[in-house]
């Protein structure tokens, strides 16, 4: 019997992704563009959430630390905490909970986008595992599609399989990482640091959005992920 526990996917931030454009561009402009690009992948959810992001563009002053008692004394030195503080400031500037409390439609669209990202990430990982075990993914896709539909996600049925309309990357995590990698590119060269920053961004985003699920009828991201894992485990057990 094979059980799986899914880990989150890791995104590598390539230097080519953060090269400055020819026009004179500010950090605020780049942050807005990165958000717009991500939101475009969320079909029906993209416009409303992108508008919310654009209302909260700010230029933050990063925290700096200094070496003492050596040749580099007095020079600001970037640390992981500097980058994490920057991402937290960016997230706070979006005021997700505040906007959700004023606008029920925004709250629901945010929940839909988060669950759609959970669906997409876990679907891909489960399908790879099932294929590696020689298991057909068609029944699995149909069942997790039904789970997504039962969770209240909008979407459409193609070839008998329901697919959420907003399936894709997390609309809050990706812009945070993109913005931080643009401001502190040298901190994202190391793969282990990329993984650490990605995990931190997911942690603070989930902490911010989870209360929205508690006030509604949709399952939390954790509950929805567990549902997908249980479905995948069922097909793996049948193949054993």
UniProtKB/Swiss-Prot annotation:
It is found in: Secreted. GO terms for biological process: actin cytoskeleton organization. GO terms for molecular function: GTPase activator activity; guanyl-nucleotide exchange factor activity. Residues 78-240 are annotated as: GEF catalytic domain. It comes from the Bacteria. GO terms for cellular component: extracellular region. Pfam families: SecIII_SopE_N (PF05364), SopE_GEF (PF07487). Keywords: GTPase activation, Guanine-nucleotide releasing factor, Secreted, Virulence. InterPro entries: SopE, SopE-like_GEF_dom_sf, SopE_GEF_dom, SopE_N_dom. Gene3D superfamilies: SopE-like, GEF domain. Belongs to the GEF (guanine exchange factor) SopE family. SopE2 is highly conserved among Salmonella isolates of the SARA collection. Activator for CDC42 by directly engaging this Rho GTPase and acting as potent guanine nucleotide exchange factor (GEF). This activation results in actin cytoskeleton rearrangements and stimulates membrane ruffling, promoting bacterial entry into non-phagocytic cells. Also activates NF-kB, p38 and ERK kinases, which are known to be involved in the induction of IL-8 expression. Chaperone InvB is required for secretion, translocation and stabilization of intracellular levels of sopE2. This is Guanine nucleotide exchange factor sopE2. It comes from Salmonella typhimurium (strain LT2 / SGSC1412 / ATCC 700720).
């Amino acid at each position: 019997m094979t059980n799986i526990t899914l880990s989150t996917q890791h995104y590598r931030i390539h230097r080519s992704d953060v090269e400055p454009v020819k026009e004179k561009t500010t950090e605020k402009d780049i942050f807005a563009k990165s958000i717009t690009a991500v939101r475009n992948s969320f079909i029906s959810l993209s416009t409303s959430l992108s508008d919310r992001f654009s209302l909260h563009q700010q230029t933050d002053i990063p925290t700096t630390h200094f070496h003492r008692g050596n040749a580099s004394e007095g020079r600001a030195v970037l640390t992981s905490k500097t980058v994490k503080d920057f991402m937290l400031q960016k997230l706070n500037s979006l005021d997700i909970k505040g906007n959700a409390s004023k606008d029920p439609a925004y709250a629901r669209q945010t929940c839909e986008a988060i669950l759609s990202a959970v669906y997409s990430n876990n679907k891909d990982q489960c399908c790879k595992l099932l294929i590696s075990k020689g298991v057909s993914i068609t029944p699995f896709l149909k069942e997790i599609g039904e789970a997504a539909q039962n969770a209240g996600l909008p979407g459409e049925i193609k070839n008998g399989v329901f697919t959420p309309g907003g399936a894709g990357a997390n609309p809050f995590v990706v812009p945070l990482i993109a913005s931080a990698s643009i401001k502190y590119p040298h901190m994202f060269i190391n793969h282990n640091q990329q993984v650490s920053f990605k995990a931190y961004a997911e942690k603070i985003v989930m902490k911010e959005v989870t209360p929205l699920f508690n006030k509604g009828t949709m399952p939390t991201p954790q509950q929805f992920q567990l549902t997908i894992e249980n479905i995948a485990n069922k097909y793996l057990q049948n193949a054993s």
